[in-house]
């Protein structure tokens, strides 16, 4: 499943089967109840069996919150995020695969992007244009949220782009890196950055 030659060639990973374990390439806590281990076809994924903390509160991913037309694509991406090392490390990052807790947080930030696409009449990741990403950037920058939240919202789009060659063509973002590969610190750090329209405001309900 994680054949490095396939990854190097940009070959998409084969579709998981309905009964493929969600935590296929993760260590499972030996004390976890096997009945609580999710499979790919389920719309709620329990990530708790992959943690080794004592008395951990159950957590996971709820795909029923994702617009129906995006659900299959988002499940495919997050299954890769859980089980496959990132083809490219995030700028400033130190890991190739996120901790499961971090994946839960990534799901929330990425969900805001998906809902924004849906609200704006963009009917799939393959239909996203560079102009759409520029508009999302502008609205995130103008949103009345913290800089850290803005960094998370933009960073998850960049992370998704980094997995594009492992995904089917119809759920890939454009080949050019989002925002021409600009460092998020540059995008977020200078309120007077030229050429960025900050007038529109992203709906905070989307976030």
Question: Whereabouts are the PLM-identified features?
Answer:
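Charge-rich, intrinsically disordered N-terminal extensions
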Residues: 1-207
